[in-house]
Amino acid sequence: MGDLTIPTMDDIDIQSKKVLLRIDINSPVDENGKIIDDSRIKAHIGTIKELINKGNSVVLISHQGRPGDKDFTSLEEHAKLISKYLDREVIFVDDVIGPYAREMIKKLENNGILLLDNIRLISEELIEAPPQQHVKSFLVKKLAPLFDIYINDAFATAHRSQPSIVGFPLALPSAAGRVMEREVSALAKIFNAEDTPKIFTLGGGKVHDTIRIIENLVRKRIADRILTGGLVAELFSVAKGMNLNPKNMEILEKLGILSLIPRARKLLLSGAPIEIPVDYKVEINGNVIEEPASKVTGIIKDIGSTTAEIYSSFIKDAKVVVLRGPMGVIEDERFKSGSKSVLKASLEGQGYVIIGGGHMISALDEDMKIDSSKVHISTGGGALLLFLSGERLPALEALSMSVVNSGD
């Protein structure tokens, strides 16, 4: 990403234009289709407002779930929420590329906002292919001629190579929206050689994903220290030869984590700057106690208080801190303290903090203040994972190829 030049909304003329804005408002819904977390919807309000304030007519496109899944729903409820947060009418169109949708787009006046229905109603949108193929898709061929500009504000889908993400930049002058721009500039700090030391705090249960991240960080010598928690810490503890007792080993085996031991051991033997807990908070017959990592008898549920202190001391001196995944079973109040400690140290330190994913946010206490000038909460789950794993992000590649005609 570091060598890609991504055009932003500052690089193109966006005054009184017809704008196609790709957002990601894919939200968790309950069994009745009611949205239970609208944070992704709120995230895009600033970009939409800016476009409307410049006299543009804006057509929004997004997906919701996948065909066959329970969360594959219409975007009608999403339109109501966007309207609520903008405090203005948002026209919902129960169509995507049909005659009705195209007619409504043509009729949309300046300062008007229209949301097309779930873009994954179009089967092409589920196909992963290069931009050169997707620019020829029905979706792009039907919609692109109706617009002056395409803006991609959907960082959470940046790892997808689908028509709505990579097709339009080859057909229209295109740029990153403000959410996308913030994500890209925040993540660029990870590769800035001057911002050291860089501390990566990696926990949670997605161990197969996390070991890919660690291998990339070590290969590119990006991380000065990697602090492990959650099941990631247990993997590296076992790889180092620690006996975590049969019960914990059984859990790791069931989750397929023991198969990763050779890769973890190889990283440790290479001298990678990986820190593992010196103590754990464990549960024994419903009781919570702390035990040294070398003498674990209970079921591991969190990092211990000594480990939390050690990790916090590393974090406070860092220039960049990346937090991905909790240190323990964060859903249980008894095992939140490890995550709270590293989060508190990050927020109180002098460095720039990137928080990936919502789990760590749930560890925030009311007295923990987030300074938006030095803290970035990423919206991109899969996209962030691929980026940290060293993969290219198709959305950014496509934007870098865009036919930008600034001022035309």
UniProtKB/Swiss-Prot annotation:
Pathway assigned in UniProt: Carbohydrate degradation; glycolysis; pyruvate from D-glyceraldehyde 3-phosphate: step 2/5
Binding site for substrate: D24, I25, N26, R40, H63, Q64, G65, R66, R120, R160
InterPro entries on file: Phosphoglycerate_kinase, Phosphoglycerate_kinase_CS, Phosphoglycerate_kinase_N, Phosphoglycerate_kinase_sf
GO biological processes: gluconeogenesis; glycolytic process
Enzyme class: transferase
Residues the entry annotates as binding ATP: E331, G357, G358, H359, M360
Chief place of localization: cytoplasm
Keyword annotations from UniProtKB, A to Z: ATP-binding, Cytoplasm, Glycolysis, Kinase, Nucleotide-binding, Transferase
Keyword Kinase among record annotations: yes
EC number: 2.7.2.3
Reaction catalysis annotation: (2R)-3-phosphoglycerate + ATP = (2R)-3-phospho-glyceroyl phosphate + ADP
Leader peptide range in chain numbering: none
Molecular function via GO: ADP binding; ATP binding; phosphoglycerate kinase activity
Gene Ontology cellular-component annotations: cytosol
UniProt keyword annotation of ATP-binding present: yes
Family: Belongs to the phosphoglycerate kinase family.
Entries under HAMAP family matching the protein: Phosphoglyc_kinase (MF_00145)
This protein's name: Phosphoglycerate kinase
Source organism of the structure: Saccharolobus solfataricus (strain ATCC 35092 / DSM 1617 / JCM 11322 / P2)
Phylogenetic classification of the source organism: Archaea, Thermoproteota, Thermoprotei, Sulfolobales, Sulfolobaceae
